[in-house]
């Protein structure tokens, strides 16, 4: 089974060809440099960039692969920026019509969960953590077609908060890799408190964000690196606390972590100790990518056959 996966939900344009579970190749173009001066993604600009980038990737794809060999075309249906999603859908639809291949709509967040399947096998039931710039949630997964959200952020996503704190500290964009690097060099010792939520598996990252911003605003001699490292430690403490509870409640056979923030070095180190079978995607499959869309389509098609 050969599947083309198309991802365009935010600011990465990516396409990948998957044969069964093997990634034949993946082509991606990022818009980070385009949005860097704004300190975040501008939806209208993102849509225009997707139009340009998806045509570049198509040209590269045709040079590498005979599209007539495809069995299915999978694309990100939701969630994401409306305009960006529409570009991916129109591109997928045009290919579907011209090649007479079936379209498979894929949920972007589920794809982040299943990205670990590219190199690992998920044992079910599983608890899944998806952490990215736009989303933070915990899944309980019985099988490929049964994903239940048992915890989610009530406000900001963790990646969004990393960007805001980084911007407040004048460290740059995107904030996640910058703060991760700083935290690998020093251990912060500022004590920020972990927010409480009504549902015990939900998150409130804005509570941490507000504490850190207030600390920055009220500090006369600000140690930027200490603040950055202390902020990261608090957020990982928070996530670890929630996952320990989820594992205790649901007794999973796997703990699966996905999304852009899953590339964080300290997060990987800390969460690896929580369960005997902890799965992370390879670093190239943590950010938004076409391979995770294709593998999700493959798994769902296999399950239904």
Curated annotation (Swiss-Prot):
Q: How is the cofactor bound?
A: Binds 1 Fe(2+) ion per subunit.
Q: Which InterPro entries does the UniProt record give?
A: ATPase_NBD, Gcp-like_dom, KAE1/TsaD, TsaD
**Amino-acid positions noted as binding substrate in the UniProt annotation, renumbered to this chain:** 130-134, 163, 176, 180, 264
GO biological process terms held by the UniProt record = tRNA threonylcarbamoyladenosine modification
Highest taxon of the lineage: Bacteria
Per UniProt, which keywords does this protein have?
Acyltransferase, Cytoplasm, Iron, Metal-binding, Transferase, tRNA processing
Q: Where in the cell is it found?
A: Cytoplasm
Q: Which Pfam families match?
A: TsaD
The residues the record assigns to binding Fe cation are: 108, 112, 288
Do the record's keywords include Mitochondrion?
no
Q: What is its EC number?
A: 2.3.1.234
ATP-binding among keywords? no
Cellular component terms per the entry's GO annotation: cytoplasm
What does it catalyze?
L-threonylcarbamoyladenylate + adenosine(37) in tRNA = N(6)-L-threonylcarbamoyladenosine(37) in tRNA + AMP + H(+)
Q: Any idea which GO molecular function terms this record carries?
A: iron ion binding; N(6)-L-threonylcarbamoyladenine synthase activity
Cofactors (names): Fe(2+)
Q: What does this protein do?
A: Required for the formation of a threonylcarbamoyl group on adenosine at position 37 (t(6)A37) in tRNAs that read codons beginning with adenine. Is involved in the transfer of the threonylcarbamoyl moiety of threonylcarbamoyl-AMP (TC-AMP) to the N6 group of A37, together with TsaE and TsaB. TsaD likely plays a direct catalytic role in this reaction.
Regarding protein family, the annotation reads: Belongs to the KAE1 / TsaD family.
Supply the name of the protein.
tRNA N6-adenosine threonylcarbamoyltransferase
Organism of provenance: Mycoplasma mobile (strain ATCC 43663 / 163K / NCTC 11711) (Mesomycoplasma mobile)
